[in-house]
């Protein structure tokens, strides 16, 4: 037979939804009377950028990758509920906003509770974002993204670019040098402190 430790478990929640609810803080206070310590197992970091989902590209690596087209484009990289799992999706579409007027893309990453701020930044995904000029043809965007992915695999793209018309070449080349989305300076440390603060809230209520 095995013994069950009734004082060991986990709590999963979204601070944005319950962080301001007095009932939730009451729950934390109750838990504080039952446990001697609490540690951060993992947390999801969400970062929104005011860019159309069509103007974002997630760089792939050797991990499992999946793309789903439903209520916008959603890309997944890695294994769910494991550190460095990434999800990039159309937040405006999820909120049922007019995506022609509101451009909002969310980058989510699952973080290990043991990570330092430096490790969090090291695992931050390579997401490229840009602002397409009005009137940009869909085929230019598609070709540009495809060639950018080929270039990341160190495959030749110049031969293909030179097969395009003279006016299309510079437009497509722009997709080969789109900037990466980076977290604001100091943001990783602030988010870690906030995440660990919820553990302190449990222990501090003892």
Which residues fall in each region the model found?
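Structured, helix-rich domain cores that form ligand/interaction pockets
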Residues: 1-163, 183-205
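Short, basic interhelical loop/turn and adjoining N-cap
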Residues: 162-175
